[in-house]
């Protein structure tokens, strides 16, 4: 299968390059810096720069490569920053997705869009299934939901993958908003880095979700795309925890004694509202008989054992 992987330099993108190694993959990123260590097959095209908000660039890339599938991992996810300026989030998370869908329709390519648990408000208090009505609390969640709606309206050959709290070896900029705004690196790496500073660490304890290892999600996506069973899917590691509980498990696995202090979302005072309960049930994957997502504790243990902190 010819796959155009947009956002190949991110956490999920890099793990997808590995998981899709048996396919013909062209990776794109905002810039090619940071991809030097990614080993591609000799006959694969080198990763190229692509601005997803530039319609001409998108058209040229899609029409020259003519993929069977486009996987869009590109996203603007600085949740708190988006509350102050939602325009960029709408451009990247929604309008660019709509353009991709229209272009994919022209070349008859399927489109896979990675969405978020933040499309829900958390009021259900039980795991969300794919059919539950979304109601985002934040501008970020609204931008991702807009992307979902525009994709569904434009092109039926699509996969929408809702997931949560991604962490992986590539790290991610701006993914630790609930701990310290503008921290670089994913939540796990941020926790391990803050532990070296010797100060108490405050982590919210009233947001329950399922942090997910990108290696596991990439493997699940690789399995799903073989089915051509288009639609909306929830895909997270199994189980649930608060971010405080997750942080404590990070330190336990790392063998670190750290003063971790639980704090409420209200006391933490982040600009964007988060759902108090956004656990996703992988109902559609289970219905297909292909849910391979292991418990979050097992995934985290493997990640911490790798000893990679960025």
PLM features: residue spans?
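N-terminal Rossmann NAD(P)H-binding glycine-rich loop of SDR-like oxidoreductase domains
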Residues: 3-22
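N-terminal Rossmann-fold cofactor-binding loop
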Residues: 27-37, 51-52, 74-75
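Glycine-rich NAD(P)-binding loop of the Rossmann-fold in SDR/ketoreductase-type enzymes
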Residues: 53, 84, 88-99, 134, ...
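Conserved C-terminal active-site "lid" loop/helix of NAD(P)H-dependent oxidoreductases
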Residues: 242-248, 264-303, 308-310
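NAD(P)H-binding glycine-rich loop region in Rossmannoid oxidoreductase-like domains
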Residues: 49-92, 103
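NAD(P)-dependent short-chain dehydrogenase/reductase
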Residues: 149-208, 216
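Conserved Rossmann-fold NAD(P)-dependent oxidoreductase catalytic core, especially the SDR/UDP-sugar
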Residues: 98-135, 154
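Mid/C-terminal beta-alpha module of Rossmann-like enzyme folds, strongest
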Residues: 204, 220-221, 227-271, 276
């Amino acid at each position: 299968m010819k796959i155009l992987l947009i956002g190949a330099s991110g956490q999920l993108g890099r793990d997808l390059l590995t998981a899709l190694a048996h396919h013909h993959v062209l990776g794109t990123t905002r810039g090619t810096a940071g991809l030097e260590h990614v080993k591609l097959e000799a006959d694969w095209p080198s990763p190229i720069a692509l601005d997803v908000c530039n319609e001409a660039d998108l058209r040229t890339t899609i029409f020259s490569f003519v993929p069977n599938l486009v996987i869009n991992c590109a996203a603007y996810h600085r949740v708190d920053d988006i509350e102050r300026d939602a325009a960029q989030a709408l451009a990247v998370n929604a309008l660019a997705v709509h353009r991709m869908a229209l272009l994919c329709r022209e070349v008859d390519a399927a489109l896979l869009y990675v969405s978020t648990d933040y499309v829900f408000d958390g009021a259900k208090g039980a795991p969300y299934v794919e059919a539950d009505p979304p109601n985002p609390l934040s501008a970020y969640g609204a931008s991702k939901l807009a992307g979902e709606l525009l994709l569904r309206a434009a092109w039926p050959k699509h996969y929408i993958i809702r997931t949560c709290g991604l962490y992986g070896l590539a790290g991610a900029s701006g993914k630790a908003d609930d701990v310290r705004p503008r921290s670089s690196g994913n939540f796990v790496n941020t926790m391990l880095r803050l532990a070296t500073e010797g100060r108490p660490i405050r982590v919210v304890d009233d947001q329950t979700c399922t942090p997910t290892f990108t290696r596991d999600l990439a493997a699940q996506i690789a399995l799903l795309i073989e089915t051509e069973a288009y639609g909306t899917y929830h895909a997270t590691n199994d189980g649930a925890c608060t971010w405080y509980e997750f942080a404590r498990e990070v330190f336990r696995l790392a063998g670190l004694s750290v003063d971790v202090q639980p704090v409420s979302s209200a006391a933490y005072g982040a600009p964007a509202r988060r759902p108090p309960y956004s656990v996703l049930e992988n109902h559609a994957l289970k219905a297909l008989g292909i849910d391979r997502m292991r418990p979050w504790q097992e995934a985290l243990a493997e990640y911490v054992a790798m000893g990679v902190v960025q």
